[in-house]
Amino acid sequence: MIKSILDNDLYKFTMQMAVLELFPKAEAEYRFTNRGLQRFSREFVEELRRVIDEEISGLRLTEEEYRWLGEKCPFLKPMYLEYLKNFRFKPEEVEICLTRENDLDMRIKGPWHSTILWEIVLMAAVSELYFTTIEKEWNGSTKNPGTPESATLESVLEAYGEKILEIGKVLEENGCLFSEFGTRRRRSFELHDQVMRSLVRIKTLTGTSNVYFAKKYGVKPIGTVGHEWIMGTSALVGLRYANRFAFENWVDVYNGDLGIALTDTFGSEAFFKDMDLKLSKIYDGFRHDSGDPYTFVDRVIEHYGKMGIDPMKKVIVFSDALNAEAAVKLKKYCEGKINCSFGIGTSLTNNSEFFRESPPLNMVIKLHSINGIPVVKLSDSPEKETGERDALRVANYIVGRKGLDE
């Protein structure tokens, strides 16, 4: 299910290093949110607990993985790699239970530098266990198009690999540079492996966010920073200054490496106010993760124009619920205006067109507080807001989006 400590997204490791360097004493709490209609079972919760206690707790960095990280990820400092070599997941940091509504209540609590690696690992485990203990038909008697009812898991994986190859060829034919970003909501480890086997045949694949598969398939591990870096910073320095402090601190830690700035933590307008000339020049580009992507392209170009920066020397990385069709349209819209690339996730590792009878889980695990101070994510899409109601109300007021009584 989780085969290696590297079976995780690169940005969790890069953020872990930054937290260790700048905020080693910070305490964090994360919470799971199920945005969909799927429900869980007692059997599911018991199996998840077993996986945490018996499997994930035993993961550790091997000597070979240690050497590979040092060679392929030179931005990870030797002191951090030594820390990671000795890192162990602590099951006691994870609390899980089944609610009366058969939903999953999951909380992760502990030092920020320790708990930061749980998010992707737990989401991948939740997704795979759901499709193992609750919706089981897909891997033995699936009714997916082109797959017979008597299909075995092997034949499903083979058919799925062909589907992914078709998607990859569409992206390649249209010149779309893209990375695989699908670890957190993958249907299973085996299916994720099949996805990568297919995608490495595509010339415009630039890499994968999953460090284990980057190593296995000889592609580039891709990733920079996630929302939690900025969210956590807001609790430590104040929300009004969080974007600026977060991105200046990131530069201090990585000296210009990993230079894609995430824009929507407190809404993109708040971000652009904080992205001054120095930061706009230092960062290679911006990542779009919510809101209308076409409006975002225009806003980014406007921002660079005001700064006297040629947008054709910068890049937008799109990562919001993308599929091949959306990527192709965005590529055409950006042509001649600004460079672009795509981080494509669930539509590769848990494609809803292929698995029509059992759609992927719509779930997140988000940072809830740092040192007991609630944090929020505002986003450019209202349905993606996370945080306590009062904290959201105050945050929207601070960034100028709403009045306190709205």
From Swiss-Prot:
A Pfam family: NAPRTase_N
InterPro entries (alphabetical): N/Namide_PRibTrfase (IPR041525), NAPRTase_N (IPR040727), Nic_PRibTrfase (IPR006406), Nic_PRibTrfase-Fam (IPR007229), Nicotinate_pribotase-like_C (IPR036068)
Gene Ontology molecular function: nicotinate phosphoribosyltransferase activity
GO biological process: NAD biosynthetic process via the salvage pathway
Post-translational modification note: Transiently phosphorylated on a His residue during the reaction cycle. Phosphorylation strongly increases the affinity for substrates and increases the rate of nicotinate D-ribonucleotide production. Dephosphorylation regenerates the low-affinity form of the enzyme, leading to product release.
Pathway: Cofactor biosynthesis; NAD(+) biosynthesis; nicotinate D-ribonucleotide from nicotinate: step 1/1
Residues annotated with Phosphohistidine modification: H227
Reactions catalysed according to its record: nicotinate + 5-phospho-alpha-D-ribose 1-diphosphate + ATP + H2O = nicotinate beta-D-ribonucleotide + ADP + phosphate + diphosphate
Gene Ontology cellular component terms for the protein in this record: cytosol
Alphabetically ordered keywords of this record: Ligase, Phosphoprotein, Pyridine nucleotide biosynthesis
Assigned protein family: Belongs to the NAPRTase family.
Described purpose of this protein according to its UniProt entry: Catalyzes the synthesis of beta-nicotinate D-ribonucleotide from nicotinate and 5-phospho-D-ribose 1-phosphate at the expense of ATP.
Protein name as it appears in the record: Nicotinate phosphoribosyltransferase
Gene it is expressed from: pncB
